[in-house]
């Protein structure tokens, strides 16, 4: 009985995540998601996200590291949006990285910007896939679970911060997403 309850709970959480993501996407698309900028410890957000995926990394023997040059500094951001960006990028990294692979997160500051990079040793993407990766409902691999809106939502949220997101990838090698945000949003 407990196993069945755990199964129902786990799948209920997945369904809730999908519904919330669809609602967020629709709100962002309609311009109904105002940005609430505050001084945020982005390093702390990344550590929290890291902690959520740590058990999964251990179970799958995925090397999972974090590197930060931010030293606890505060940066302007919408905390909820940055959490959503991080969770989507990390979720994708885990989805497409095989057991025994690696995922790294880097936080950095450069001039009047700061940002983070999520890199995995997953399946990678072809040049054609890279051109479509931020299209809504586009999925690199239809065999894996997902809605195809995560990266579209990520791009919208990054742009609400007046930032940029880039992706580099080689098939069967790696994928790397780099999010760059302004250090001053005044």
Feature map (PLM): residue ranges:
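A conserved beta-strand-to-alpha-helix junction within the catalytic ATP-binding
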Residues: 36-51, 83, 115
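Short alpha-helical segment of the dimerization/phosphotransfer core of two-component systems
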Residues: 10-15
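Short conserved segment of the HATPase_c
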Residues: 125-137
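Short beta-strand/loop element within the Bergerat-fold HATPase_c
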Residues: 100-112
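Helix-loop junction within the histidine kinase core
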Residues: 26-37
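Conserved catalytic submotifs in the C-terminal HATPase_c
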Residues: 36-41, 58, 63-73
